[in-house]
């Protein structure tokens, strides 16, 4: 980030404050950045979790949460390899990012499933809450994710951990996306049976 990430931090703070008007917000901050984060944030609905990370995109590095029929919540800790590992990952040191799911679950007091070594980022899937999942072949079938698994085996993992019944595979994500075609920047459910699509 240029200039000590000042503009980015201000933008993150504005987004967090806007969301906090409606929802609780949890932000990871490096220990050395906590004081400056506190200066930018005023809502008591924003909670800072002190932890080192290599990347700011918690949707990808963080836990995926599932809720059972009784309302109990649990996280899922996928394997994270910086969007492709040795094959075409974006960076080689991601040890702290791998710890993000466990850290957030511990902070919230939630238990979690350990789905490792299955590689998945949160932005590579989108669900409707009623058993349907969207993803792309470009991403989940990428040689940098789970090269030893077949498409059917990947689908079984998704069904096992997310309790989905229907998996819709789009062939590609947005052209030249550095995440190998994540679904979250091109297609998402707004309600069951209805999607928004970047065109």
Where do the protein language model's features map onto the residues?
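The feature marks the mature, well-folded catalytic cores of soluble enzymes
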Residues: 1-199
